[in-house]
From Swiss-Prot:
This is 11 kDa excretory-secretory protein. It comes from Trichostrongylus colubriformis.
Length: 92
């Protein structure tokens, strides 16, 4: 992963918001997918690490203030509003 390479060079800490933004730009940029599909892809990516999803949703750098319009912000806002539902989906 690009993130792991950059992190090994000391560019990011695991809890940096840049990590999530970088990964999602790399994987989702320019595909014009609906937000629901981007959310589905991101859930699939992190489905084995519920703590990572929870950390991303709780990250204070990702406030849902209505000013951000990027795909990563939509995904994180979805996480914040639907965490319990998503957790139930993984268990099914």
């Amino acid at each position: 992963m690009l993130y792991k390479k950059l992190r090994s060079q000391g560019n990011f800490r695991k809890n940096d918001s840049a990590y999530f933004k970088l990964e999602n730009k790399r994987e989702l940029k320019g595909d014009n997918l609906p937000v629901e599909e981007k959310v589905r892809q991101t859930i699939e990516k992190f489905k084995d690490d519920v703590s990572e999803i929870r950390r991303l949703a709780d990250d204070s750098d990702f406030g849902c203030n209505g000013k951000e319009t990027g795909g990563a912000m939509h995904i994180v806002c979805f996480f914040q509003k639907n965490y319990d539902w998503m957790k139930g989906q993984w268990q099914n």
